Amino acid sequence: MTLAPYACDPAQSRGRRFAEPAAPTRSDFQRDRDRIVHSTAFRRLVYKTKVFLNHEGDLFRTRLTHSLEVAQLGRSIARSLHLNEDLVEAIALAHDLGHTPFGHAGQDALNDCLKQHNPLSAGFEHNLQSLRVVDSLEERYPAYDGLNLTFETREGILKHCSRRNARQIEAREPDGVARRFVDQKPNGPHWRQPGLEAQLANLADEIAYNAHDIDDGVRSGLLTMAQLQDVELVDQYSFEARQQHPGLQGRRWLFETIRLMLSAQVYDVMDATRAALGQALPGDVQAVRQSAALGRVRKVNGAIS
């Protein structure tokens, strides 16, 4: 597939922290993906849950299954927009490597502990921990710590970051992956947001958990379709599912509702991104990073955010 001019081209990557020779048969972003899949932290995702505890059932999502779903959605969107599928997949597979067990409750508990231990601390941020995993904590290679991923993959992993933590990263790595959280001057030398591949991996994450947390909630018995129909979006697509398939009941009704919701949100992302690209007309990935119009891609007509 031919990449769009505004896509991240591995041949134009800003490189790795430690220089390495290119691989003969794989692009740099393919190598990033492969390193993530073979990492210890990736295997550990199988025991980290999103909402329910691991022992409560083998059909509930874990961080591993969620990451695979995010990668699948991300690749589909990237292909339609002529973006780099390998980069989207690498970011998607790595985005939860630093997440705590017990979902966001675990993150909140660690955050409180860190702030009590050091009142000056910016606390625990799972995106920052994901970056630590790939930069420092993995010990697989003789010449360096971490996975030595490309700048573009690391930039996408750092989805959120407090300014205090970003400044600490910048002190070690000036003009690096955290720069956009430190200095966001309009039309300045730095950028407002990462490339489109990182933004789409972020959106694929939101689409995946918005839909699949519904599935897990109903499967657990904590939610019913009747309760979910109080949510406008669910009500709309559950009605549409029965219009298309009269008499649809039970889990098939739930699955068809979720499928319709997923499809609508994916197409909404594609349409909103194309509209923003038509407004911004970026000539390369750096223009994407600096474009105010493309910083609004996340909003997606309010259906996701």
Regions found by a protein language model. Give the residues of each.
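Basic, low-complexity intrinsically disordered segments
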Residues: 81
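Short alpha-helical catalytic segment bearing the HExxH-like zincin motif
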Residues: 88-93, 202
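Aromatic/His-enriched, Gly/Pro-containing loop or helix-boundary segments
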Residues: 116-124
